[in-house]
Each structure stands twice: as structure tokens, then as C-alpha cells.
Amino acid sequence: MNRIILFLLAFLCIVEAQAQGKHKTVNLTPPRPKVGVVLSGGGAKGAAHIGVLKYLEEIGMPVDYVVGTSMGSIIGGLYAMGYSPDELAQLIANMNWSQYVGNSIDRSAMSEEVRKRSSTMAVNIPFSFNGILNKKEAGNTVSFLPSAYVNNTSLINLFNDLCVGYQKDMDFNDLPIPFACVATDIKTGKEVDIRHGSVPLAMRASMAIPGVFSPVNMDGHLLVDGGLVNNFPADLLQEMGANIIIGVDVSDRDTIHDGEILSLPEVLNGLVDNAVNSKRDDNQAICDIYLAPDITGYGTMSFTHEAIDTLVQRGYQKAKEFREPLMKIKQHLESKSNGPLTKQLRASKARNLADAPVYVSSIVLNQTNQKKSVWLLKKGHLKVNEFLSEKDINHAIDVYRGTGAFDDITYNLTENGIDTIHGTAQETYTLSMNFKPTHPHVFGLGIRYDTEEGAALLLNLGINEKMLSGFKLSLTGKLSYNPKFNITGTYSNLNLGNFSMAYDYRSEHYKAMIFDKSNTNLQYSQHKFSAYASPFRLINFSNTIGISYTATSFDRLTPFDFSNDTINQTLISSVNFQNNNLLSPFIRISYDNRDLNYYAKHGIYTIFKCLFHFDTKGKASTVPELYYSFLGYLTPYNSRFTIIPQVYARCIFKSPTMANLWNIVGGEVASRHFDQQFPFIGIYHTDFVNDLATVLRCDLRYRLFEKHYITATYNFLYGRNLFGKNHSITEDNIYSGVGLQYAYNSFIGPISLTAQWSDYTKQFSAYFSIGYSF
């Protein structure tokens, strides 16, 4: 027994000695010093970071850690996931930053309701009554307003596209290159160093400029741009273990002059730079190499191809100026290494979804019920067990956003493992989409001024308008010389479409050149009740079938002098401008795939309507009506020129005695005084046309500068009397008109000035307008 115990003790001593020997052998060659790179914030100027990284790779400088703030966190985060400097330069230059900053979506993805609102309202504010009441109880009555101009959707999904393989929560030390970034907790005002979690969300938080981008909720913090507290976080590199620190600073220190800060991001960037100067000085002092590339002439929003290329080159040149000290560091590192220095990634490179589709074996839609999930998948054309590309996923997200029902939609892809797909081993993924419903109600405001009608204000309250289905109520009022009011109740069903009932009131005061006489003041008021269904809910195609009851009263008619005109004495007699009541079943079909509401470059907009008008008082016979309009937009080779052919045609198949059914042309705004009114350049006011009226028009538009346009117009009018006696201006003749317009597409709507002439009026006239048409 004693021998056994002695043997075991001896064996343990030998094992311990061997372990100690191995431990001593490992420590004989200590690891080489670690190199960290810190990248400051600075918006588009951060492109200079790419040039520095490119030079470091060219000379063989290893990068063991990367930290960044704001734009530095984006460049640094992508570099840490394995993207090369050349790939980064291409990515940054090709990104449509105006789309991401504006959080815009293509018009083609918008629903008809959202398109209509965006084309008439300058301001739209979603809200909820519960939210207002809760905030009122808390003493804050305005916090239901949006927290920023841009929410999470566009940017976070851009980062998700670039981070496939690293979208899940993780330790950032497990990235190909260990990474960290800085954000600011707006609840405490303190710095938050992000070293774990979701990489895309971390980058999004670090560059969330207050007031421009919405804050990000992350691990109990409400995070905004890290530049508010630490725009050059070299100290964070020290905490991570970097022994040698290379800093790249593209902030505007000592370079801001009068008139240089023009945009909101640049103003905020200037304030941030001044606020964090003291900490930046401390962080600059701990850098072994401090690089400040020349950013003269460029600002936070300089995201043009030329600007990006120049800034990348300037960053490269600045690093090249430090070749000697950088090479000394490299030589020192080589002396501490067992072999030559090479770029080593600790894990595989992130996958760019734009480069290749992924095979999706399952789809999960969060924060939606089963019925809505089925409808959303069908609406977005998403299917399981198929390859989905970046375009497929983001198009679906745009379509979902285009409904107006969601404030935030993000996605992530989770690896499920390898599976055999069509005889080939493929990584399969689960696509998870996260939906954050927006506030259900919306308040809209539109403003307009023009020389025909004067000032106008459009107010709208949409109750439950932002919901996908259920009962919705819309109240709209136009306050102007010609007031209008509409109330519409709609029941929306995801599968069956919309069923609506509406009441409209309008009071019109306008001038008309009746029967080839001088301008005459006319006035009428109208009450209209409608019930209709829209059974199909397609993005570009819509159809409506229903019935309306219209009561029209001509309240005042300026007397005519027709003492020597027996024909027109008869036409202007008691019938034409007397009160009338019409019952009108109708069908309306439209197709609209224009790329923009105003100043479109591509697409068509066409409407077909068929109506039957019954005089409920029995004084007139049934009047059938056909209406057709077409607008096309053609921009050859994406040039500055856009050709816009237009057709307007309407036929009433019995000569009506009611003036409100006659064909009407004139003015620049379609349907201004009557639903059937055609626009015509050269006839400033309105006039009545035959039973068959056709306007052919062609606009040639040239874009001078961004948002500045000049348009030349030629149109002609042909009318023919098919039924009954002639009561129109045209008398089977053709009249033409020409116009020249200058316009600026402002944030409150177009601002335009039009000069026009026609051979009917034989007079020049001018028309000026500001704001959207409504």
C-alpha cells in the first residue's frame, strides 16, 4: 500500500514538472505588441479613413483592433468584418446617401393612399390619442412628435445587407478583427462603449445624429451619436489591449469658417467638435501616430463620387507622409514576431447580400398576427425554400413601408447550417422580419398659393388611416376662396379590398368665357354622396365601382347681354344653369407607375372612367359619359430632358342641358372647378366645349440644376358637336396654345411661373403658384 502511494506521488511530481516546463517554454517568446487603429467621426469626410487603411495594408502593417465613432464606426466595423479598403471605397461611393438620410422609398412601392397624401400634404404627423393623453398626464404634450427626421429602417437594413454572418448578438472580439464603437446615452449624457451585441445596430447607434436620425434602444440605453462625448476614442483602444495606436482624425478642428456649415448635420457636427475638444486632446496625446488628412473643401454630407475619391486619396497621401515612423513600427513588430507580418483575420469575412442571394428555408414575421403575416408574405412576394437576394428582401420591406402602417421594419438572417440544395451543399438561413407599427392616426397639412385662386390651406385628419385593416375615417377641409370639405368612412379588408362611403361639399367661384364672350363670373355649390368599392389592392393598378348622388345649385349667374344672339338666348335660358340632382353609377380604372409625384422621369399615369347620369327630377334624359386621360414620361438615357406626351378626352353621348355636365377646359390645374375639367395652357380661366372634347399636349422639360426645371408646352384642343345644338367655344375648330414654365421643386411643393398664349384668347397671360396641387 505504501509503495502504491509513493508511486502516485512520484507520478504527480513528474506531471507537474512537465507542465511547468511547458509553461516556461511558452513565455520564452512573448507575443508581439498589438496595433490598434482609431477612426474619428466626420460624416462623408470619413472616406479619408479608407485611404489610410489602404496604405497600412500596402506596407504590411497589421491591424489587431479597430475602434470608431459615427462614420468611423461604419468604416471600422466593416473593415473589422473583413472588407478590404478597395471594397469599402466602392461601397461608400455607390451608396445612395440621400435615400438613406431622407429615409425615402420608391414611389412604386407606395400604396395609392400614401401616394395621394405625399402629393398633396407638405406635413404629415402620425399620432395616437392614447399617446397624447399619456404625455399630457406627464406634462409633455408635444413628445408624440417624431424623435428625428429619419428612423432606423433604411440605415439598419443597409448595414444588415453588408453584415450577413454577423447580424446576431455576439462578442465583437470574435469578429475577424476585434472591434468597438462609441455611442452616447441621452438619458444620462454619458459615453457607452459598445463591444458586444448586434454589429449593425451598434454602427447605427454610433452615428445617430440627434434630430436627424432616431435614437437606438440597446441594452437598456437610448443611444445617439458617440461624437457627442468621444469623437476620437483612442482611450478605448488602450482598454482593449492595444500597445501601439494609430489615430485618424477627420473632424473639423480649426477648419470651420463663415458660411461653410450649410446643412443640419454639419451644424451639429461643428457643435460636437467644440464640445469634445478637451477629450480629443487627451486621446491625441496617447496616439503613437496621429494622422489628420486634409479635408478642406468637403463637409459632412459630401457623398458624391468625386468627393469620396478625393478624400480616399487624401487619406492615403497623409498616411504616406508618415511612411518613416510607420515603417519603424513595422520593423519593431517584425523583430518581436516569429515570421513576416501578414494580414490575419480571426474569422471568415462577412457576406455582402448584394453579391449573392441566400437560401431561405424559413421566414418569421414578428409583431404581426397570422392573418397579417400571410397577407404580408404574399404582398412582398417572399417565399420559403427559395434563394432571396438583397433586392428581394429590401423590395418587400419597401412595399411594407409603403402601406404606411409601419414605423420601423428591420430584418436579420440566421444561419441554420449546411443542407443539400439542388445537389449542392448550401448554407441555409432563417429570415426574421421585425415590424414596429406606427401611430394609427395622422394629421396632414398642405399649403398653396396661385394667381387664379389665391391662398389655400388643406387640413386632414385620418383616424386609423395607418392601420392595415379595419374601419378608417378621413376628414379633409380646404380653406380658400373656393372651399371644399370631405368626410370618408372606409372599411378595409386585407382580402376583399376597401368599401367606402363619402360626403363632399364644394363651393366654386370662377370665371368662364361662355359662348365666346368675355370672362363671366360664375358660382355654384355642390353636395355629393358616394358609396363605392375598391376590390383590388395592387400597387400601380386601382379600380373603383360605385354610385354617387350629386345636388348642384347655381347660386348666382352674372347677366349676359345676348339681345342680338337668339341662339345663345335659348342656350342660356332657364334650363342650363338651374339646380339639378343627378344619380350616377360609375366605374373608374387607373394605372400609375410614375417614379415621382412631381417632375417624374419615367412611367405613365392613365385614367378611364365610365358614368351614367340620371336626372332624378326627370327633367332631362340619361347622359352616358366616357373619360380618358394619359400622361407619359420618357427620359432618354437618363438625360436632363424629359418628354411628356398627354391626352385628355371626354365624350358625353347626349347633349346635356345641365351646365355641370358639359366638357370644360382651361387653367393649369386639372379638375380645379369641375371634376371633368381639362387643363389647357393658353386659356387662363375656363370655357365650355362640345359633346366630344380632346386635348393633345406635349411638354419638353429640361432640368437646369438639381430641382430646377424649364418646361416648354404645346397643346391643342379639338371639340365636336355630336348631339344636339352647339353650345361650345370650338364650333368644330382646332385651337392651340403654347407656354413656357420655370419651376423649382421645393420641400413644400413646386414653385412655378408660367407664361402662356393661345390663338383662342389671342392674349398673353402669366400664372404663378406655390405648393402642391389640391
Language-model features and meaning:
Residues 390-391, 402, 408-418, 424-587, ...:
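Gram-negative/organellar outer-membrane beta-barrel architecture
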Residues 442-447, 575, 585-705:
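C-terminal outer-membrane beta-barrel translocator/porin domains of Gram-negative envelope proteins
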Residues 4-13:
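Sec-dependent N-terminal signal peptides
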Residues 701-735:
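C-terminal hydrophobic structural anchor segments
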Residues 42, 72, 88, 189, ...:
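Buried hydrophobic packing residues in well-ordered domains
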